Amino acid sequence: MRDIALFVKDFQKGTELSNLLTNIDMHVTFAESIYDLPDQCQIGIIDLDDEKFGNVKFVSELNRHTEMMLLGYMEKITKDIQDKLKAAGCNMILPTASVVKNIPSVIREIAK
């Protein structure tokens, strides 16, 4: 079982993601900061539309202090914002509309 941290404040989206991830044998932790993470957390999923989590400073800090693969999702992806977040350490950015549908296959691929 692998550990995944969800940096998601939207209750509905968090519940959907948590259920899907639990179904593919992932251990899910809802986190508010880097200090809430399990010791061996491999993947972080970030709501990039959230004011607290969806900024270069937070992503950069998370990247600097952990060795997690960081996956983000946001409503509207622009090249400028995507480039900044990727430079800060976000490995992949998905559209919000497809994150629930695609996250199980993305996580399975990463977990190989």
What are these model-derived regions, one by one?
Residues 45-62:
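Conserved phosphotransfer microenvironments
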Residues 89-101:
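Output/docking surface of receiver
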Residues 6-11, 46-50, 74-75:
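Structural motif
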